[in-house]
Amino acid sequence: MHQPPIPHVASTDPQIADLIQAEAKRQFEKLRMIASENYVSLAVLEASGSVLTNKYSEGYPGRRYYEGQQFIDPIETIAVQRAVDLFGVDHANVQPYSGSPANLAVYLAFCSPGDTVMGMSLPMGGHLTHGWSVSVTGKWFRPVRYGVRADTGRLDLDEVRDLARKERPKIIFCGGTAIPRTIDFPAFAEIAAETGAVLVADIAHIAGLVAGGAHPSPVGYADVITTTTHKTLRGPRGAMIMSTAEHASAIDKAVFPGLQGGPHDHTTAAIAVALKEAAAPDFRTYAHQIVANSRALAAALTERGYSLVSGGTDNHLILIDLTPQEIGGKPAARALDRAGIEVNYNTVPFDTRKPFDPSGLRIGTSSITTRGLTEQHMPQVAAWMDESIRAATKQDDAVIDRIAGQVRELLAGFPMPGFAPQP
């Protein structure tokens, strides 16, 4: 049963209540290994569903366009200060609705339409908003893209440097959605300084690892840092932009009134709660456990003959190239889902297949680490993944059904925030 209980939803709209309950049960029974997902705490859930959703608060604390802000202002001020303290930055804006609007606000702060911007190619591991052609950022601006080395699968910093010198972009983005290795922020900072670019570190995927000391911080190297507040940070669906003091005013004006109206106050409160949780010692333990689990899982998959992009991982994310297995990422992901293991199909660098039917799988360990799984469980997880993929190639539903039952049996012993099993 969903926790907290939802009796009022059940009374008003049983159809939606049933779907919420079904989703809660699904999340409880699955090895949720999509790298961009996690579980939030009950405290974050409660803040997200509070009466703060009733309030409108255009502007910033002390400078609002609506009355009745005497409790909203301190909530946002607390959230901002906690972000500043946790990440060690000069300034933080907690109002962006999500990661894409946060990145768009950065463009608004520093670029004009037609300006050159630089980011990692999406098929190589970047993000849509770093200038990819189907995104508004690739239509309004002139994107140039860097990638990874064919021989190592790692970021090609020589290419980054050469492109930056040649193209002189206004912004250089570092970070992405499928980068399994540590990002070299000092090297990016050196390139940005040489070419006069604003360096933006998009740490949406690794923010929790940075906060917990399990990944190097971009603070002191990047001019601006954007991040979602979910993923490894275990907060609500929101975002933050952090910056040096020099850029604080430009960022704030870009978010409001440049891009958004009123912030979502219930989300701001939930961000504040999540940031307090992330400052606790047990969160640091959690962040390091994510990396330990990823490395253990990567080693177990490698032992079973799987090819990992870059040869392994330094963070929460593993990218498998299934080309040697002669199965596409989409059918593999669907088979795994039926077996109780939730991942997403993903392009791999230099993929010869189409994006909607790529060669890879993207796997993350954030959620299963929140549930309490450790390194000792990773060989079994790898075995289930391997068996499921092999069964998919043989259309062996019996094997997949057996594994789904074993996954449910394992997870019954690991509590999930937001769900209470029925006796």
Located regions from the model:
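Flexible, glycine/charged-enriched surface loops at secondary-structure junctions
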Residues: 30, 61-62, 91, 262-265, ...
